[in-house]
Amino acid sequence: MTDKCIICGFKDKNKLFMLCSNLKLMGDHFPDSPSIMTECPNCGLIYVDMDATQENFNRYYTSPNSNPFGYYEIYGEEHTNNYFNDILNKFEDKITNDSYILDHAGGSGDFVKFLQTNGYKNSEMLEISEKCIEIADKKGVKSVEGDGTKIITSLEKKYDLITMIHSLEHFMDIDKVIESAKNMLKDDGYLYIEVPDAEKYSNTDSVPYTMYTFEHIYHFTLDTMDNLGAAYGLEVVDKGQFFKAESYDVLYALYKKSEKSKTKYTSSCKDAVLNYKNTSANRLKPFIDNFEKTQEKLILWGIGASTALLMNGTFDRCNVLQLIDRNKQRQGLKYSISNKDYIVQDPDDIKDNNATIVVLPYWYHDSIMKQIKEMGFKNPVKSLMG
């Protein structure tokens, strides 16, 4: 477990609620131990406290089982281009077509390709996943290989702008990530950080608890973005909120190098995550009440990073038959529902054609529905998306 707050260094912590009892759903190399949503009582940072390390997450993101997604395939061309234009507008007046730009944890390279197409020819990305680098290379995107937490001494230049677009919240060692970025940034350069907006979690039109995905280790509000800058010597030049690609609310902060300053306590993030927990439970209630009443046999499909919280009592009074996930590294994991142990199984292990399949995830909903159809299941299918 974490021994101190990574922002302010405070050693005490407030445990808010358990996310999951078994971190091994992230992979065999993760510890068989719980993860707890936690608040720093000194600065108000909200983080997931667990026994995992940055190396565990590095292995997770470089695993052969990882599925790099492209913005265009998820959101479509129109929504993606509008979203990328929204991002570009946040710092367009700070750069030129000759500026050196690095997209931190750039994934499959979609944003860098967008920048190149719009005239920013000196754009490249930092990425740890060889699979992502291969995909980006086919798009003509240049990559710097690295995990984002180490100082890269081989770089021949520094950057005018570094972007972290939905990457910072995925790192345990955000202190090392920020210091590495500052080292790669010119003294008069800018750092753009964009993360999910915790204050708007309850507005998210998706499966309840989706924003508590285990891949998101830290949760942020505009106030905690101020503290992030204060702790690591970054001055906030601009910050704000907007809606990402017709999907969910995000916030951003544009920083430049400065001196470290004192953090201030804010309850905004704690209030937001607790409100989202209550909102999610209330949204689920009619759905779960019906299952409890009918006692129809249920096959729960999609036991992963964004759905494990649903295993914490949600289905305890329902007639659960099986837990299913197609990810091999999750098969064999054990969960207890109403004091009965269940093992996550392969879709091929489904034998009861009358049981109702309940699709749990938001992120992989469409691919699961497609797989159910392709495998020829005749079961009734319901989704937590409604």
Where are these regions (language model features)?
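Conserved S-adenosyl-L-methionine
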Residues: 14-20, 234-245
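Hydrophobic, well-ordered beta-alpha structural blocks that scaffold small-molecule cofactor pockets
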Residues: 250-386
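Class I S-adenosyl-L-methionine
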Residues: 217, 226-231, 246, 259-270
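Short aromatic-enriched loop/helix-cap "lid" or pocket-rim segments at secondary-structure transitions
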Residues: 18-20, 202-207, 250-252, 334-336
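Conserved N-terminal segment of class I S-adenosyl-L-methionine
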Residues: 1-165, 175-178, 250-254, 258-294, ...
